[in-house]
């Protein structure tokens, strides 16, 4: 193992993966970082192989996907693995963010770590949207048309920006070429951000369920936490294999198996499932510009968490029953937003979406600051009582 400490490149690997000291009390919720790294590697590899056979042309894109499925050796495995790992990627990052919110991992000194993570989430959504357009089925075409048209809400320059993205006056060959180029290159930018995320993590070390910084009770990453990560990695491969080989279209949309036809509008136009909560927020506001701002704001609002949580304690929210109740409501509300986004924009889903959107933003702007101030007040009262006793 001496080479890991003397070689310039391997010393970096040793510092971050092998000898990195980790808190002894990390639970399995801390395993999602390694699962996300694995998903990114799988996506880049399968994406590179798929790009060898894909043709970014409006007349040939759909047929090239069918060629991959039917004629390329194990092409169907490549395509279904790429599509389903994308879904798992978002499942894992939502749990990863939820864990950060639950345990206060966004608190100083890890503000930079949290901020990079939010940027990664936004970039992932952009990459996912670009990839959804590439098969050029019905949902791809109309999804691209609707989502890119949102930019027309920008005053004065909106329509010009939309036409610049399209490369014309509608989704066309130029659009598909641009989306393919960006979908190919942006995952490498995502990988660079993931490395920056790791560097920021290594600077102050990983958080832990108690929220306490302790340099004494730590173990090396290898072998303890490496083998712990392998448990969830093997479980992930088991579930992924079952879905890829038995239920490959479980998280897909049937309309995307119909070639794109600009003359026929699908009965419902919905994005991929992992974008549905934010799509519901967009639809819940009648004004187009305000809806677009709310949708992007619902992502970027995560950046303010380190500044609106005034609590003097950190760690598990079970230490504060009030926070625990409101966080549970927030999670249920987020899931409800996803269900609302999957349904048509009719009553009662319009009203339900507006209520859920209000709760979503209220959690960050009202609930977190108020509950943290209440917690500090109760702690001060308890301290005064203990001193006077």
Swiss-Prot record:
<dbReference type="Pfam" id="PF00032">
    <property type="entry name" value="Cytochrom_B_C"/>
</dbReference>
<feature type="transmembrane region" description="Helical">
    <location>
        <begin position="322"/>
        <end position="342"/>
    </location>
</feature>
<dbReference type="InterPro" id="IPR005798">
    <property type="entry name" value="Cyt_b/b6_C"/>
</dbReference>
<keyword id="KW-0496">Mitochondrion</keyword>
<dbReference type="InterPro" id="IPR027387">
    <property type="entry name" value="Cytb/b6-like_sf"/>
</dbReference>
<keyword id="KW-0812">Transmembrane</keyword>
<dbReference type="InterPro" id="IPR048260">
    <property type="entry name" value="Cytochrome_b_C_euk/bac"/>
</dbReference>
<dbReference type="GO" id="GO:0046872">
    <property type="term" value="F:metal ion binding"/>
</dbReference>
<feature type="binding site" description="axial binding residue">
    <location>
        <position position="197"/>
    </location>
    <ligand>
        <name>heme b b566</name>
    </ligand>
</feature>
<keyword id="KW-0830">Ubiquinone</keyword>
<feature type="binding site" description="axial binding residue">
    <location>
        <position position="96"/>
    </location>
    <ligand>
        <name>heme b b566</name>
    </ligand>
</feature>
<keyword id="KW-0408">Iron</keyword>
<keyword id="KW-0813">Transport</keyword>
<dbReference type="InterPro" id="IPR048259">
    <property type="entry name" value="Cytochrome_b_N_euk/bac"/>
</dbReference>
<comment type="function">
    <text>Component of the ubiquinol-cytochrome c reductase complex (complex III or cytochrome b-c1 complex) that is part of the mitochondrial respiratory chain. The b-c1 complex mediates electron transfer from ubiquinol to cytochrome c. Contributes to the generation of a proton gradient across the mitochondrial membrane that is then used for ATP synthesis.</text>
</comment>
<keyword id="KW-0999">Mitochondrion inner membrane</keyword>
<dbReference type="GO" id="GO:0005743">
    <property type="term" value="C:mitochondrial inner membrane"/>
</dbReference>
<feature type="transmembrane region" description="Helical">
    <location>
        <begin position="32"/>
        <end position="52"/>
    </location>
</feature>
<keyword id="KW-0679">Respiratory chain</keyword>
<dbReference type="GO" id="GO:0045275">
    <property type="term" value="C:respiratory chain complex III"/>
</dbReference>
<feature type="binding site" description="axial binding residue">
    <location>
        <position position="183"/>
    </location>
    <ligand>
        <name>heme b b562</name>
    </ligand>
</feature>
<feature type="transmembrane region" description="Helical">
    <location>
        <begin position="289"/>
        <end position="309"/>
    </location>
</feature>
<dbReference type="InterPro" id="IPR030689">
    <property type="entry name" value="Cytochrome_b"/>
</dbReference>
<dbReference type="Pfam" id="PF00033">
    <property type="entry name" value="Cytochrome_B"/>
</dbReference>
<dbReference type="GO" id="GO:0008121">
    <property type="term" value="F:ubiquinol-cytochrome-c reductase activity"/>
</dbReference>
<feature type="transmembrane region" description="Helical">
    <location>
        <begin position="349"/>
        <end position="369"/>
    </location>
</feature>
<comment type="subunit">
    <text>Fungal cytochrome b-c1 complex contains 10 subunits; 3 respiratory subunits, 2 core proteins and 5 low-molecular weight proteins. Cytochrome b-c1 complex is a homodimer.</text>
</comment>
<protein>
    <recommendedName>
        <fullName>Cytochrome b</fullName>
    </recommendedName>
</protein>
<feature type="transmembrane region" description="Helical">
    <location>
        <begin position="225"/>
        <end position="245"/>
    </location>
</feature>
<dbReference type="InterPro" id="IPR005797">
    <property type="entry name" value="Cyt_b/b6_N"/>
</dbReference>
<feature type="binding site" description="axial binding residue">
    <location>
        <position position="82"/>
    </location>
    <ligand>
        <name>heme b b562</name>
    </ligand>
</feature>
<keyword id="KW-0349">Heme</keyword>
<comment type="similarity">
    <text>Belongs to the cytochrome b family.</text>
</comment>
<keyword id="KW-1133">Transmembrane helix</keyword>
<feature type="transmembrane region" description="Helical">
    <location>
        <begin position="113"/>
        <end position="133"/>
    </location>
</feature>
<dbReference type="InterPro" id="IPR016174">
    <property type="entry name" value="Di-haem_cyt_TM"/>
</dbReference>
<keyword id="KW-0249">Electron transport</keyword>
<feature type="transmembrane region" description="Helical">
    <location>
        <begin position="76"/>
        <end position="98"/>
    </location>
</feature>
<feature type="binding site">
    <location>
        <position position="202"/>
    </location>
    <ligand>
        <name>a ubiquinone</name>
    </ligand>
</feature>
<feature type="transmembrane region" description="Helical">
    <location>
        <begin position="179"/>
        <end position="199"/>
    </location>
</feature>
<keyword id="KW-0472">Membrane</keyword>
<dbReference type="GO" id="GO:0006122">
    <property type="term" value="P:mitochondrial electron transport, ubiquinol to cytochrome c"/>
</dbReference>
């Amino acid at each position: 193992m001496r080479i890991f400490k003397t070689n310039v490149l391997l010393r970096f690997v040793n510092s971050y993966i092998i000898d990195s000291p980790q808190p002894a009390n990390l639970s399995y919720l801390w395993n999602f970082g390694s699962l996300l790294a694995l998903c990114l590697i799988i996506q880049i590899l399968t994406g590179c192989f798929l790009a060898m056979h894909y043709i970014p042309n409006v007349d040939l894109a759909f047929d090239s996907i069918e060629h991959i499925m039917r004629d390329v050796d194990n092409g169907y495995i490549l395509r279904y693995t790429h599509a389903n790992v994308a879904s798992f990627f978002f499942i894992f990052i939502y749990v990863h963010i939820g864990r950060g919110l639950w345990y206060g991992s966004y608190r100083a000194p890890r503000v930079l770590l949290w901020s990079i993570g939010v940027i990664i989430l936004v970039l992932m959504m952009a990459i996912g949207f670009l990839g959804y357009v590439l098969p050029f089925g019905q949902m791809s075409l109309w999804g691209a048309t609707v989502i890119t048209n949102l930019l027309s809400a920008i005053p004065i320059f909106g329509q010009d920006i939309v036409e610049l993205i399209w490369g014309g006056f509608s989704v066309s060959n130029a659009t598909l070429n641009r989306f393919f180029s960006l979908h190919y290159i942006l995952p490498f930018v995502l990988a660079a951000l993931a490395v920056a995320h790791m560097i920021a993590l290594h600077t102050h070390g990983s958080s832990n369920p108690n929220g306490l910084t302790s340099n004494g009770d730590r173990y090396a990453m290898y072998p303890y936490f490496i083998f712990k990560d392998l448990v969830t990695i093997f479980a992930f491969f088991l579930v992924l294999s079952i879905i890829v080989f038995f239920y490959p279209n479980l998280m897909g949309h049937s309309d995307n198996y119909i070639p794109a036809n600009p003359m026929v509008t699908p009965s419902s136009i919905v994005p991929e499932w992992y974008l549905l909560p934010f799509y519901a927020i967009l639809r819940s506001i009648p004004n187009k510009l305000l809806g677009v701002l709310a949708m992007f704001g619902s992502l970027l609002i995560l950046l303010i968490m380190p500044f609106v949580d005034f609590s003097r304690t950190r760690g598990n929210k079970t230490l504060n029953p009030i926070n625990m109740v409101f966080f549970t409501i927030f999670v249920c509300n987020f899931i409800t937003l996803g269900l609302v986004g999957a349904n048509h924009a009719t009553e009662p889903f319009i009203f339900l979406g507006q209520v859920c959107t209000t709760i979503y933003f209220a959690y960050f702007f009202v609930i977190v600051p108020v509950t943290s101030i209440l917690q500090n007040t109760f702690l001060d009262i308890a301290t005064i009582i203990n001193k006077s006793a």
